[in-house]
Amino acid sequence: SSIAQAPGDLAGRVVALEQGKSFASAFSSLAESLEGLKTSIEGEIKNTVSTLNTEMHGLADIQAKLISAGGSGNAANSLLDQRDKSIAAISEFVGLSADYKLRGDATLTLGSTGNGPFLVQSKSAGVISVAFEEGKATVYAGTGASITATKQATSGVLAGLISAYDIINQTG
């Protein structure tokens, strides 16, 4: 470097100091960008969870009407179509397993195993939430008193957002 070759040269020192300041400024800007991205993704996760919970409650309402209709007739066919559209919408947000009952309703569980927390069971909707703790996003799901942390949210929009959030936290 020019400073090593001419330690008494003030111009070389000034250039090195300015380059150091520029380098520090670039890192500071990158850190701010990562923090902004993290905040943005956290907001997207919250919006996704809110929409997902609304969709799950909508499906529970459709299934209540379907059960009341007795599972037959034109009204039931329309409700079955609504049920299927609602399940498709929910499946975009999270991977799920669906178990269709004889009366036309479906039980949805989180994840592909069929053993995950209930999302919708008959006329009842579960709850999904996400907690941001120690640089990690943790999914909680279930019904009533059995809402617990789960690792079953491995696909869909929610899983993608959580993966992005976790990667940014590891980077920052």
Located regions from the model:
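Alpha-helical heptad-repeat coiled-coil segments that mediate oligomerization/polymerization in large
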Residues: 6-16, 20-23, 27-83, 97, ...
